[in-house]
From Swiss-Prot:
The protein's name in its UniProt record: Cell division protein FtsB
Family: Belongs to the FtsB family.
Sequence ranges on the Cytoplasmic membrane side: 1-3
GO cellular component terms attached to this protein's record: cell division site; cell septum; plasma membrane
Phylogenetic placement of the source organism: Bacteria, Pseudomonadati, Pseudomonadota, Betaproteobacteria, Burkholderiales
Length: 113
């Protein structure tokens, strides 16, 4: 009886091996699902980037708006008759007087009289 129980237990383990660790086992399926989720996230990011680039390409091909915008912001160009005005934030004020030196009769200056 004990031998039969041991044999059944070993057979049960042999049957469970492919379910958990085999080529199509649960661990492999879990890993593939994780990879699929990560790839889906990367694909979505790339789709958004591609859509942005397609819009920019279409704008460059069809109109002069994008070219004019780049010329203004990247090259600092202005149209004829326009005046370029730039507002600069004021710099923080610096004190005109230098800091005072420490007093000559300080405790550190005494030689231990």
């Amino acid at each position: 009886m004990r031998l039969i129980s041991l044999l059944l237990f070993v057979l049960l383990l042999a049957i469970q091996y492919p379910l958990w660790l085999g080529k199509g086992g649960w661990l492999r399926v879990w890993d593939l699902n994780r990879q699929l989720t990560e790839q889906g996230t990367r694909n979505q990011t790339l789709k958004l980037r591609n859509a942005k680039l397609e819009g920019e390409v279409a704008d460059l091909q069809d109109g002069t708006g994008a070219i004019e915008e780049r010329a203004r912001y990247e090259l600092g160009m202005v149209r004829e008759g326009e005046v370029f005005v730039q507002f600069v934030a004021p710099a923080p004020k610096v004190s005109a007087t230098p800091p005072l030196p420490p007093p000559a009769n300080s405790v550190a200056g005494r030689g231990g009289h």
